[in-house]
From Swiss-Prot:
Region (Disordered): 74-97, 152-227
Domain HTH myb-type: residue ranges: 12-72
Gene behind the chain: PHL7
Keywords: Coiled coil, DNA-binding, Nucleus, Transcription, Transcription regulation
Signal sequence, start to end: none
Gene Ontology MF terms: DNA binding; DNA-binding transcription factor activity
GO (cellular component) term, any one: nucleus
Family the entry assigns: Belongs to the MYB-CC family.
InterPro entries, per the entry: Homeodomain-like_sf (IPR009057), Myb_CC_LHEQLE (IPR025756), Myb_dom (IPR017930), Myb_dom_plants (IPR006447), PHR1-like (IPR046955), SANT/Myb (IPR001005)
Protein name: Myb family transcription factor PHL7
Length: 286
């Protein structure tokens, strides 16, 4: 310990400066600790415990005050700093942990969403494939049905064109015969005037009802117009009745002779008289 000599007076000697070395400070700290700490230690007690020569109560009091200030203020500031650091560290760690958890959760959600999207895409692809397969199957069925309908329709076409088996088959008569039959089929009962008028008509090859020669047709007309005697109230009068058409195409003389039968109720003399009378009337008309 070094003391400055300040002069002869005692007041100046009591206020001489003291340099606190490391050893002296250690002894001061031990004395304060023995006395119960900086709060309980008193300058007199510290001075007595230290027992250093030249050390005054003023020196101990001043150093004790500085020690107390240095003891409490740095401790409080350090504690405050430590608390702040601890809180800030906790906050940072909490933030880091929460942010890490949030990031992890976000990544998990993103992966889940991607997985679901992938599954949906796969389902859509499978559905598209099924739709295409179903369309091809339906198209094949339609083509098969059209082919079968075409095959069944081909043999059925001739069957529909045939005549109904229930209906009678058409006759083999030619249209010429039908026409000639219609044209040459007059009433079976003709009057004498109509038969006589037929003699006056010229016979030409173009006649539809006259196919043979003029001589043959004349003979046929004479044979066809045989008189038939009908018994009346006054006597017997000749009545000419034609049972068949006078002129028919395609028929021979023998047919007309066999068909026209004369019925007489009187003897042959009456028939001859009627023929003469008929020939006379025919000659007058010609």
């Amino acid at each position: 310990m070094e003391a400055d000599n300040g002069g002869p007076n005692s007041s100046h000697a009591s206020k001489q400066r003291l340099r606190w070395t490391h050893e002296l400070h250690e002894r001061f700290v031990d004395a304060v600790a023995q006395l119960g700490g900086p709060d309980r230690a008193t300058p007199k007690g510290v001075l007595r415990v230290m027992g250093v020569q030249g050390l005054t109560i003023y020196h101990v009091k001043s150093h004790l005050q500085k020690y107390r200030l240095a003891k409490y203020l740095p401790d409080s500031s350090s504690e405050g700093k430590k608390t702040d650091k601890k809180e800030s560290g906790d906050m940072l760690s909490g933030l880091d942990g929460s942010s890490g958890m949030q990031i992890t959760e976000a990544l998990k959600l993103q992966m889940e969403v991607q997985k679901r999207l992938h599954e949906q895409l796969e389902v859509q692809r499978q559905l598209q494939l099924r739709i295409e397969a179903q369309g091809k199957y339906l198209k094949k069925i339609i083509e098969e049905q059209q082919r079968l309908s075409g095959v069944l329709g081909e043999p059925s076409a001739p069957v529909t064109g045939d005549s109904d088996p229930a209906t009678p088959a058409p006759t083999s008569e030619s249209p010429l015969q039908d026409k000639s039959g219609k044209d040459c089929g007059p009433d079976k009962s003709l009057s004498v005037d109509e038969s006589l008028s037929s003699y006056r008509e010229p016979l030409t090859p173009d006649s539809g009802c006259n196919i043979g020669s003029p001589d043959e047709s004349t003979g046929e007309e004479r044979l066809s117009k045989k008189p038939r005697l009908v018994r009346g109230a006054a006597g017997y009068t000749p009545d000419i009745v034609v049972g068949h058409p006078i002129l028919e195409s395609g028929l021979n003389t023998s047919y007309h002779q066999s068909d026209h039968v004369l019925a007489f109720d009187q003897p042959s003399t009456s028939l001859l008289g009627a023929e003469e009378q008929l020939d006379k009337v025919s000659g007058d008309n010609l």
